[in-house]
C-alpha cells in the first residue's frame, strides 16, 4: 500500500472513531479542502510530514500517535 493510501485510511479510521466529519477535520486542522480531498481520493503521490502534523492537530493528537497504527507500519507500505 502506498503511504498516501495508508494516511487516507488512517484519517477515515479516526473520523469514524471520533464521530467527526471530514469538514470538521479540515476546520480544526487548517488543511485546505483541496489538499484534504486530494489525500482522501488518492490524487496525491505523497503526503508531507507538515500536513500529517496539521491533520494530527485537527484530531487533537500528537503526530507520533497518528502514525502509530498498523496501517502505517513500514512493513505494510510501498516505499518509493
Locations of regions flagged by a protein language model:
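Phosphate-coordinating loops and pocket residues in cytosolic domains that bind phosphorylated ligands
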Residues: 8, 41, 68
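The DNA-recognition helices of helix-turn-helix-type DNA-binding domains
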Residues: 32, 43, 70-74
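The alpha-helix within a helix-turn-helix
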Residues: 15, 26, 56
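Short, basic-rich loop-to-helix N-cap that marks the start of a DNA-contacting helix
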Residues: 43-54
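Short, charged recognition helix plus adjacent turn
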Residues: 38, 67-80
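Short alpha-helical DNA-recognition segment
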Residues: 19-38
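A short, Lys/Arg-rich alpha-helix, primarily the initiator
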Residues: 1-21
Amino acid at each position: 500500500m502506498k503511504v498516501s493510501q495508508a494516511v487516507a485510511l488512517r484519517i477515515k479510521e479516526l473520523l469514524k472513531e471520533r464521530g467527526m466529519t471530514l469538514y470538521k477535520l479540515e476546520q480544526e486542522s487548517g488543511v485546505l479542502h483541496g489538499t484534504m480531498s486530494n489525500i482522501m481520493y488518492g490524487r496525491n503521490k505523497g503526503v508531507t510530514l507538515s500536513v500529517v502534523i496539521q491533520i494530527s492537530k485537527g484530531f487533537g493528537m500528537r503526530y507520533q500517535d497518528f502514525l502509530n497504527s498498523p496501517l502505517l507500519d513500514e512493513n505494510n507500505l510501498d516505499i518509493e
